[in-house]
From Swiss-Prot:
Function according to Swiss-Prot or TrEMBL: The light-modulated chloroplast enzyme, encoded by a nuclear gene and expressed primarily in leaves, is responsible for the reassimilation of the ammonia generated by photorespiration.
Lineage, top ranks: Eukaryota, Viridiplantae, Streptophyta, Embryophyta, Tracheophyta
Entry's localization field: Plastid, Chloroplast
Start and end residues of each stretch annotated as Disordered: 99-119
Domain GS catalytic: 161-430
Gene this chain is encoded by: GS2
UniProt-recorded name of the protein: Glutamine synthetase leaf isozyme, chloroplastic
Gene Ontology biological process terms, A to Z: glutamine biosynthetic process
General remark: In pea there are distinct isozymes in leaves, roots and nodules.
Range annotated as the organelle transit peptide: 1-49
Source species: Pisum sativum (Garden pea)
Length: 430
């Protein structure tokens, strides 16, 4: 016997008053029942808890309601407001009804939440205001329902400390930055953990699989763990309108990567945060824990990064390789500033091993995955293209990283003396 949500009396077409148990409603009957509702009835229909028996035992109708598409029966939509929590890496969300479909964030009303419950405001002044900034189709509810990526402000309109989008938007709206149309391609790595033991998916509990080597981009039950989650996430992002461009299994078993981009300016951060939220929801449903820890397992195992590919209009045009080298020079001079902004716990990952450079030293190279900045062979050959910043950790804030790259390469200028010394140090001719 199970308690389920069932239509009120006028909708119980196959339930008799004399029967001690409700007649089971099949999936076909349930669909027929729903399709017969008019908009008027859909608004007024009440649901109550009832018990249902079946020949096979208990039937749980919650799934039927979860899959119920409300779009044919109402103009109202459900908007899931998403924001970044107090740790700066956690995602929070809550839902509200909006009276009609929307096509732009400006049509979505501001909202608020209890910041004292997320570590973002004191209890005596706990209200934090959500400003809608980007909308995506909701892959979980379907129809006209939406996901709304927001940033957070005090009631006075000041961005709260964890709102990194506000500063990023200022940088991306600078005329010098706008003129260069910065592109970003972000490679988000993540690790899947078994729920109760917090140990990587596919690993023996308390033990280790065979050494790294056979797992990268592999197929097979003994080499690939979590493909269903990766693929579900891929399709959900495409449905949502996120600019996801690919996915692959990573070097460490139980670790995966997806790529978002190329995206222009602030859009890169919006799309990464929306994709992270969707991934959290999918792992929630799958009963698997998601971690963005940059080094989830100590020892001879790869860490998890968020490599960020970056180019400007000048880099993509003829002669762009010289512009790229000048950008690399600027990045070398601001290495410490970037490292401090590139994610928590990154020192455990950037050791100079496992396809990383040392956190303390800046380096660059062509096709060298052991450098801070990698330039592809095609970029060198064509004399134009992009650079890859391999320093960001998997838990980095994409608003911070993308904006800092633009600031360091387009808005910040070193002294001639510092530039000359840096060029000599990293063997870079500009």
């Amino acid at each position: 016997m199970a308690q389920i949500l069932a239509p009120s009396t006028q909708w119980q077409m196959r339930i008799t008053k004399t029967s001690p148990c409700a007649t089971p409603i099949t999936s076909k009957m349930w669909s027929s029942l729903v399709m017969k509702q008019t908009k008027k009835v859909a608004h007024s229909a009440k649901f109550r808890v009832m018990a249902v028996n079946s020949e096979n035992g208990t039937i749980n109708r919650v799934e039927d309601l979860l899959n119920l598409d409300i779009t044919p029966f109402t103009d109202s939509i459900i908007a899931e407001y998403i924001w970044i929590g107090g740790t700066g890496i956690d995602v929070r969300s809550k839902s509200r009804t909006i009276s009609k479909p929307v096509s732009h964030p400006s049509e979505v009303p501001k909202w608020n939440y209890d910041g004292s419950s997320t570590g973002q405001a004191p209890g005596e002044d706990s209200e934090v205001i959500l400003y809608p900034q980007a909308i995506f189709k909701d892959p979980f509810r379907g129809g006209n329902n939406i996901l709304v990526v927001c940033d957070a402000y005090t009631p006075a309109g000041e961005p709260i400390p964890t709102n990194k989008r506000h500063r990023a938007a200022e940088i991306f709206s600078n005329p010098k930055v706008e003129a260069e149309i910065p592109w970003y391609g972000i490679e988000q790595e993540y690790t899947l953990l078994q729920t109760n033991v917090k140990w990587p998916l596919g690993w023996p509990v308390g033990g280790y699989p065979g050494p790294q080597g056979p797992y990268y981009c592999a197929a097979g039950a003994d080499k690939s763990f979590g493909r269903d989650i990766s693929d579900a996430h891929y399709k959900a992002c495409i449905y949502a309108g996120i600019n996801i461009s690919g996915t692959n299994g990573e070097v460490m078993p139980g670790q995966w990567e997806y790529q978002v981009g190329p995206s222009v300016g602030i859009e890169a951060g919006d799309h990464i945060w929306a994709s992270r939220y969707i991934l959290e929801r999918i792992t929630e449903q799958a009963g698997v824990v998601l971690t963005l820890d940059p080094k989830p397992i100590e020892g001879d195992w790869n860490g998890a990064g968020c490599h960020t590919n970056y180019s400007t209009k000048s880099m993509r045009e003829d002669g762009g390789f010289e512009v790229i080298k000048k950008a690399i020079l600027n990045l070398s001079l601001r290495h410490k500033i970037h490292i401090e902004a590139y994610g928590e716990g990154n020192e455990r990952r950037l050791t100079g091993k496992h396809e990383t450079a040392s956190i303390n030293d800046f380096s660059w190279g062509v096709a060298n995955r052991g450098c801070s900045i990698r330039v592809g062979r095609d970029t060198e050959k064509n004399g134009k293209g992009y650079l890859e910043d391999r320093r960001p950790a998997s838990n980095m804030d994409p608003y911070v990283v993308t904006a800092l790259l633009a600031e360091s390469t387009l808005l910040w200028e070193p002294t001639l003396e510092a530039e000359a010394l840096a060029a000599q140090k990293i063997a870079l001719k500009v």
